[in-house]
Amino acid sequence: METATLVAISISGLLVSFTGYALYTAFGQPSEQLRDPFEEHGD
């Protein structure tokens, strides 16, 4: 394969991996440990 194709596939894979990890952190098991500043600050 060409170098440009491998670079494009690598960057795309990293982007998909980062997005998946971000979604897992936001909505998965670790999300229970996140604090909600809006709930802490009652008006």
Curated annotation (Swiss-Prot):
Q: Name one Pfam family in it.
A: PsbN
UniProt-annotated location(s): Plastid, Chloroplast thylakoid membrane
Does the keyword section mention Plastid?
Answer: yes
Q: How is the protein disposed in the membrane?
A: Single-pass membrane protein
The alphabetical list of record keywords is: Chloroplast, Membrane, Plastid, Thylakoid, Transmembrane, Transmembrane helix
Q: Which residues cross the membrane?
A: 5-27
GO-annotated cellular components: chloroplast thylakoid membrane
Q: What is this protein called?
A: Protein PsbN
What is the source species? Houttuynia cordata (Chameleon plant)
* Gene that this sequence comes from: psbN
